[in-house]
């Protein structure tokens, strides 16, 4: 009787010898080995004494297989770590490691982890620093409505490493949409910047922000803290619970109206048309015929200050760039081996809340962006048709008094640092930190591995400073205070 389960047949291989040529001898070579834990079967004519040797060979083969698999896993773990983990310097495929914030190709740093991640994804998709920066800025417009948004005013500074030129993005003169409400210019400004310097298609940059607004995002600590300190009456129901209390950390928020505006903007072929979708809906909300003149952002050559060590670039008036250049020039001409801590800046009438981000690649191209709604949550009243908070920045004198991004291009032979970028949140105190950091760098030039903005901002009061640099074909990002702003790279 045949067994219920068929036996497993193996061929025992013998070294071929000329004397073994007959069919009968070849048939005798074939032996039947049955793998059965109950013991060996002798139905094939095998001698029981031969089975232990076969089992030993099988065990040895399995052991070798296990060892080989283990070695392969260890090799993958040591060389295949994913680069660009949030806030990490994961070792690249080349096998050497870096400190956190140092990457081979490009990096981005922003106030929101979700937006830094989105910027990195645009890098990986083949985009450049402008694609990553603009995409992250649109993301911040969704997840950080307390500091920025589609109603915000934007300033930017872009340095092209290939040409050596730096270009300033200006918001144009402050305009009023309605009493106490600033004319929104974010969409045409960002679209203009991308049209001239971006690489990926414009709609690609809005896919992530649209998804966040449509499917929802989580309230982070920064937004939750701002909500806790704010009268939320004009922010409900978007940022409130059903009982009117502000949302806390980890609460999911969806803004479908904003998603619809972003979708329309993604289809606009020109910067001017990208802002029209928002303006037409805002006019309906406010009962207006529409603004007589649209926003007028511009791209123009950055201001320059030649120095013995290199060239300093910043944004033109009405930003705070010219005043900062005057301050830096006066500080460098004054006697003394080192810069004075926290040099005083010209006093501004107000210190509006703002948002900053920075991107850099290993070739030395840098993009710095800063934006503001003037106050926390701007006007404090949510547009029901658009899900947008408008700015209350309407005084032309204050249109850019808070904006002062700086880029230093090194042309000396004494240091390997190619480009250094600094951008601070919109307070005079933070700008003093930025000025002091630049003066310290000029007085004692060091590599980014040796130097970083690790000074506590408490030395010059509160503020946020982002620093990016390109050095020895690597991109470097860091912040003051350390850890305040998530970064990613690849």
Swiss-Prot record:
Residues 1-52 are cytoplasmic. InterPro entries: Gamma-glutamyltransfase (IPR052688), GGT_ssub (IPR043137), Ntn_hydrolases_N (IPR029055). Keywords: Acyltransferase, Glutathione biosynthesis, Glycoprotein, Hydrolase, Membrane, Signal-anchor, Transferase, Transmembrane, Transmembrane helix, Zymogen. It is found in: Membrane. It comes from the Eukaryota. Its main location: membrane. It catalyses: an N-terminal (5-L-glutamyl)-[peptide] + an alpha-amino acid = 5-L-glutamyl amino acid + an N-terminal L-alpha-aminoacyl-[peptide]; glutathione + H2O = L-cysteinylglycine + L-glutamate; an S-substituted glutathione + H2O = an S-substituted L-cysteinylglycine + L-glutamate. It holds the Pfam family G_glu_transpept. Residues 74-490 are extracellular. The chain crosses the membrane at residues 53-73. Its EC number is 3.4.19.13, 2.3.2.2. The keyword RNA-binding does not apply. GO terms for cellular component: membrane. It is a single-pass type II membrane protein. Belongs to the gamma-glutamyltransferase family. Heterodimer composed of the light and heavy chains. The active site is located in the light chain. This is Glutathione hydrolase 6. It comes from Bos taurus.
